[in-house]
Amino acid sequence: MKKKAEGMSLRETFAIHRRAARDMRRIAPGCFMPFILCAVVEAASPYAVIWLSARLVDELSTLRRPEILAKWVLWIVAVSAAAALLKAVLERWKNVRSELLDRQKEVLYTEKFLRMDYADCDRQETRDLFSQIRQNADWSGWGFAHLKLYYTQAVQGITGILGAAALTVSLFTRQVPTSAGKLTALNHPLFLVGILLLIAAVTCLGPALVGRAYSAWNTLAEQVCFGNRVFSHFAFMQPGDKEKDMDRRMYRQSELAEHYVRTVNIFGVGSPVAKASQTTVGLSKALAASLSAVLSGVVYVFVCLKALGGAFGIGSVTQYVSAVTTFSGNAALLLSTVSHMRANAEFLKAIYTFLDIPNSMYQGSLTTEKRSDRQYDVEFKDVSFRYPGSDIWALRHVNMRFKVGKRLAIVGENGSGKTTFIKLLCRLYDPQEGQILLNGIDIRKYRYDDYMGIFSVVFQDFQLICQPLGANVAGSMEYDRDRARKALIDAGFADRLAAMEKGLDTMLYKNLSEDGVEVSGGEAQKIAIARALYKDAPFIILDEPTAALDPIAEAEIYSKFDEIAGNKTAIYISHRLSSCKFCDEIAVFHEGAVIQQGSHAELLADRGGKYYALWNAQAQYYTE
């Protein structure tokens, strides 16, 4: 993330934090209340004890009446106990809300990814920006995570300042008696001005030094971003990935990881973090603490001299010293919070740069009219496409038309444009040149959700989630159980379904349930196919979803799929050409262009064609 050297103004800082707070309150209503209440109690309770303790010391140093001493002691115990109990209750509430906030902030990112144009979602710049946001959060919790801290510190600072002022004002109004001799000089206005200037200086210089430390820390965050990403990947992500654990053990990848982490070295001896802690960051914070100690010493001398002169009793000494130093500390906390917010504003800016990525894909208004006759005609007219940021055409001058109810197979070598063709058909991307027509109308003129609704797709990198089997098939917790069961049986999952004690209610995977079941790659593909069948859309597309199956199982599923597809238009992508023999038409892709089109027999008859070469290249492994 590139930051402006001068940073954000206070107005911009408060504006972006207000926006962030609104977003947090929207997804987690009332989320900040426990932090506010806890801060008030945390800041106010010490002053009550300070005032009561001063009264107790005054009584001890004068009349020492047992009943009065007992009264003050009981008050101190009662107030301390009540404050501790209240803080414990609020702390519990705060911890629950803190966990909720940490989880719910992910909702904003999820919502954005779900609303974002797929082209932007798939763009490398978007991925890099989101990775930077993650690294900022991992670095020191920058971004949304700090909002609860600011609420706490701001309320605590304001409450502390008001409480300290109430206990301190009499320090400057009480006069040393004239009988105190030279100590009456403490009544001179210059002493008052001097003490106030010292308080102001420490209050301002302390946060300035802390702000300098934050600034250095932020600069460091940019410098070590890649190193922190490497460390986080190997230290936190890889160990939990059980699917890669076999490779790690077999090939001793942990040694490679350790070497990589040592090479980037951001936390060890001599690392950028260590150097910053020993220089700018460490020295700035140490100097800020030293100034606070100097203030405490000067205030102690001033208060003790006034007490010695007879301005007030000895009990007030602890009251005034504690109040003045606490006043300075809370004022410094308030200013430090502002400095911290200015630093955090830059990280929030990165977050909102991501959240504010506009959707540029044209949204039409026509409906696709869920036709009962399923008469949909699709045509690619001179379509060319290249991925954002690339100079290479993934598809070039593609012309193709397929009729309703037909079976179309798309074949070709890796990188020939097969999956790109499907992405354009499903309007995950729009072509740079040419048109894709549905019933003679440019697909961009249809409502996006309506258009997407006519497709059931099983991508080669499909995803199942840790939810019940039936919910995975239906895409909803409420579904037609008979229909879901039939879809699974049609997809070849009947035997495994019968072996599942809970049937459709069986939880997939163990991430969220100890009773979850693990499914093999082939079984997962059958579930994904069942999901496509359950949707019952007029177009069904299989983008190499059976790669984890053996050739015989794949051929069986495709043959059965041809039966259950009925009058649907089916499009198949497969590297195994034998699985596509039953299709009405086969399109051969090569380097982004359709170079052959026809039936299996027609294409095989062309001995100089690409299809013939591909067919025989595969056939040699299945014939003697």
Model-assigned labels for residue ranges:
Residues 1-46, 61-72, 90-94, 122-162, ...:
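Membrane-integrated ABC transporters
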Residues 1-18, 99-145, 224-273, 345-358, ...:
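Extended non-transmembrane interhelical loops and adjacent amphipathic helices
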Residues 32-89, 157-214, 298, 305-314, ...:
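Transmembrane helix-loop-helix hairpins at lipid-water interfaces of multipass membrane proteins
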Residues 249-254, 352-406, 486, 563-566:
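Primarily ABC-family ATPase nucleotide-binding module
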Residues 299, 320-357:
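Cytosolic ends of transmembrane helices, especially the final helix of ABC transmembrane type-1 domains
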Residues 426:
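Helix-to-loop junction immediately C-terminal to a conserved catalytic motif
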Residues 437, 494-527, 536, 621-624:
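ABC-fold ATPase nucleotide-binding domain signature/coupling loops
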Residues 502-503, 559, 576-624:
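C-terminal portion of ABC ATPase nucleotide-binding domains
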